[in-house]
């Protein structure tokens, strides 16, 4: 079981960003964390997340009785289907935030109450990983996270991976040290670039110097598992500049890099106004090669280095809880959508929508996620026609087969391969 925590507060809104975030509304911070804690406590009851004996003793009154918990108010999305058409086959970094985009759906109120529903939610074990994303988690005082982790800590597995995102300009050494005290052992910085003109183009409010300072502060705080996000495929990118980006990563000495191709999302300032680099696909391959030369091995289309257990869990199809506005959770064959509005979530954190996933839809997601990563596609998950198409791709050299799984030889061709296999 994984846990995703969404912090929507931002210092500014980047023109390429389609993730749920708000600028301002800091007066709601305390109420927002109260809502997330209430949401978490309700979900651990329903999904029967277990505590260790030691944690159960230590937590005392942390366990919440059903009589004192809030009430889930779920609606059902009966006709939702993943938006995996050829035009929209590029599943961007949303996958790293547990969210395959869905086409417009007809929503029908079903009056479901999760606490009393017939979903099969037997004990799912402990929480193996936590990912605090945003938004900008470092824009919120660490004291709020202390409250949150008082509720979460009793349910964590030993050696759980706990990641927080942070921006270089707001992640002070004090904040990073306090987050480490909460249990955080991995930090992901939204660097995006080391070039000042590119940072300005992307609407970032930090400079290159602050990236180096933030990474140094994280190391001083005792955080050694460090990721930096980079964006490539902008009109400013050239091979020479991307080579320098990779060299700067090497100089930082971080354990992980996420290198995303610029995605022009709908309903963002960039949509319809900004164009990609003319040779974006070739630049993407060039960037991959340079990052690997820096000593960080690719294990997913956009990820390199020490494997992020949380993201790996998404690609493996593990169950995950999700708390916070805009967050999306998953349990077996259901996806749960929290309110996509900050005020609405604070008012009722238990109101959610359910998307019921068919076996075919789950199979499709497994194919798309598997080809983009080291997870691969299980041979026994494919039907006869899909298996025949996979064999053709293996024969043509686009797939390799090992220990019962098919793997893409080039992650950049993953969507093309997936569409062909899925039929």
Predicted regions, residues:
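A short, conserved structural fragment
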Residues: 395-404
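Short amphipathic alpha-helical interaction segments
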Residues: 383-395
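Local cysteine-cluster metal-coordination motifs and their immediate loop/turn environment
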Residues: 8-19
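Short, amphipathic alpha-helical interaction segments positioned at domain boundaries
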Residues: 411-423
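Short, low-complexity, charge-dense intrinsically disordered segments
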Residues: 51-60, 69, 87-96, 100, ...
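C-terminal scaffold of the Radical SAM
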Residues: 1, 22-47, 98, 123-383
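Aromatic (phenylalanine/tyrosine) cluster motif
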Residues: 47, 72-74
């Amino acid at each position: 079981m994984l846990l995703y925590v969404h912090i929507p507060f931002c210092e500014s809104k980047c023109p390429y960003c389609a993730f749920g975030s708000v600028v301002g509304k800091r007066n709601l911070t305390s109420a927002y964390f109260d809502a997330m804690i209430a949401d978490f406590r309700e979900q651990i009851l329903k999904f029967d997340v277990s505590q260790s004996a030691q944690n159960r003793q230590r937590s005392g009154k942390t366990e919440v009785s059903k009589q004192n918990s809030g009430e889930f108010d779920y609606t059902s999305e009966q006709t939702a289907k993943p938006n995996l058409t050829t035009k929209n086959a590029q599943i961007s970094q949303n996958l790293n935030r547990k969210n395959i985009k869905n086409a417009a759906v007809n929503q029908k109120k079903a009056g479901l109450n999760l606490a009393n529903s017939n979903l099969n939610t037997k004990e799912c074990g402990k929480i193996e990983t936590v990912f605090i994303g945003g938004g900008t988690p470092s824009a919120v005082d660490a004291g709020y996270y202390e409250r949150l982790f008082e509720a979460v800590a009793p349910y964590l597995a030993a050696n759980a991976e706990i990641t927080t995102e942070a921006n270089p300009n707001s992640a002070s050494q004090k904040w990073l040290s306090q987050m480490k005290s909460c249990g955080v052992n991995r930090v992901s910085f939204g660097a995006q670039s080391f070039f000042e003109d590119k940072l300005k183009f992307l609407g970032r409010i930090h400079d290159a110097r602050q990236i180096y300072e933030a990474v140094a502060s994280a190391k001083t705080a005792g955080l050694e598992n460090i990721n930096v996000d980079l964006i490539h495929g902008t009109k400013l990118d050239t091979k020479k500049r991307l080579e320098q980006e990779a060299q700067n990563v090497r100089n930082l000495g971080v354990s992980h890099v996420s290198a995303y191709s610029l995605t022009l999302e709908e309903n963002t300032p960039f949509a319809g106004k900004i164009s990609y680099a003319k040779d974006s696909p070739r630049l993407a391959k060039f960037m991959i090669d340079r990052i690997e030369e820096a000593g960080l091995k690719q294990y997913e289309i956009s990820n390199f280095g020490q494997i992020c257990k949380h993201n790996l869990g998404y690609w493996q199809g593990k169950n995950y809880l999700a708390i916070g506005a805009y967050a999306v959770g998953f349990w077996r064959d259901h996806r749960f959508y929290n309110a996509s509005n900050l005020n609405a979530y604070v008012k009722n954190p238990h109101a959610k929508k359910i998307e019921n996933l068919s076996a075919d839809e789950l199979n499709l997601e497994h194919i798309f996620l598997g080809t983009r990563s080291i997870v691969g596609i299980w041979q026994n998950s494919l039907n006869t026609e899909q298996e025949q198409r996979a064999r053709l791709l293996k024969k043509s050299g686009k797939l390799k087969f090992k220990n019962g799984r098919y793997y893409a030889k080039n992650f950049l061709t993953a969507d093309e391969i997936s569409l062909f296999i899925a039929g």
